[in-house]
């Protein structure tokens, strides 16, 4: 930071003038809670991902946890370190009063885009992607958090689809009792666990269900249930057993198929209790296709 910007930052209470510090290189991608930019850090010349959170929507979300000392999205993201989790460089407040997060820029497709396009790049890479996603989610849980929005949209792949990284901790909360009370229904409806939809107490096993739905779609190019844009379709999650994954992907390794279906058990007690159990269950699987 230059000396002029340093003193200006002090006068602004440590807030950052985004326009002065970052050059926007690519138009914003608007999300539900934020805008995302490809930017150049004028101080370091580094190309970064710049996420600016919508002030009103962020305040409304955080109001649900008023008095609980919930860490911000930036604080959570910065505390996580894993090869399959996006790197967060810095975070703070803009001079306009908006939270911002600076992270590595991932110049690859979202997993959701590859699924929508039924990309051939996924062939032969699915098992590796499943393991990386599972390890990333395990790292989030081991750090003491629940992600609460595991879905293909929140995994960004490399251009060759051999690796991926977990992103977006906007709905993530500490895995503590006060943050897991019924009534806090958040996430992407198509991937919601039954206990979330039905407003029951939740824990990290809701992520395991959403992970299972995402992996199912990775192989089937279909969800285990009817797709819907709101919570009404999600009410059907867990009411009947998902079709066997082999109906859509006949070559799937049976051990992997059973592990995915166990993630999708309606009752949390019948799922894997942590991601380590899932990884252990598939440790001997060598290829996504049965030999």
Feature locations, PLM:
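AlphaC helix of the eukaryotic protein kinase fold
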Residues: 57-79
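A short, aromatic-enriched beta-strand patch in the conserved N-lobe beta-sheet
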Residues: 90-92
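Conserved short submotifs of the Hanks-type protein kinase catalytic core
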Residues: 96-110
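AlphaC helix of the protein kinase catalytic domain
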Residues: 111-121
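Activation segment signature within eukaryotic-like protein kinase domains
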Residues: 129-130
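Protein kinase catalytic-loop region centered on the HRD/HxD motif
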Residues: 135-145
């Amino acid at each position: 930071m230059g000396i002029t910007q340093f003193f200006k930052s002090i006068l602004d209470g440590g807030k950052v003038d985004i326009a002065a510090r970052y050059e926007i290189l690519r138009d914003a991608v608007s999300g539900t809670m934020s805008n995302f930019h490809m930017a150049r850090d004028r101080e370091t010349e580094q190309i970064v991902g710049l996420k600016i959170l919508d002030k009103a929507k962020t305040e409304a979300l955080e109001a649900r946890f008023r008095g609980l000392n919930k860490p911000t999205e930036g604080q959570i993201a910065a505390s996580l370190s894993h090869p399959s989790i996006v790197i967060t460089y810095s975070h703070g407040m803009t001079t306009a009063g908006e939270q911002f997060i600076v992270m590595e820029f991932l110049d690859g497709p979202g997993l959701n885009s590859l699924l929508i396009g039924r990309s051939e790049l996924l062939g032969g890479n699915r098992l590796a992607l499943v393991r990386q996603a599972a390890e990333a989610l395990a790292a989030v849980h081991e750090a003491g958090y629940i992600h609460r929005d595991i879905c293909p949209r929140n995994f960004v792949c490399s251009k060759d689809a051999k690796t991926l990284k977990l992103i977006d901790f906007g709905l993530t909360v500490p895995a503590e009792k006060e943050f897991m009370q019924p009534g806090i229904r958040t996430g992407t409806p198509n991937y919601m666990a039954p206990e979330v939809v039905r407003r029951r107490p939740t824990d990290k096993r809701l992520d395991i269900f959403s992970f299972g739905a995402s992996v199912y779609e990775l192989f089937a190019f279909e969800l285990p249930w009817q797709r819907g844009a709101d919570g009404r379709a999600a009410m059907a999650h867990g009411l009947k057993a998902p079709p066997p994954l082999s109906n859509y992907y006949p070559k799937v390794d049976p051990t992997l198929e059973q592990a995915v279906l166990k993630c999708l058990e309606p009752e949390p007690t019948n799922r894997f209790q942590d991601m380590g159990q899932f990884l252990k269950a598939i440790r001997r699987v060598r290829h996504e296709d049965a030999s």
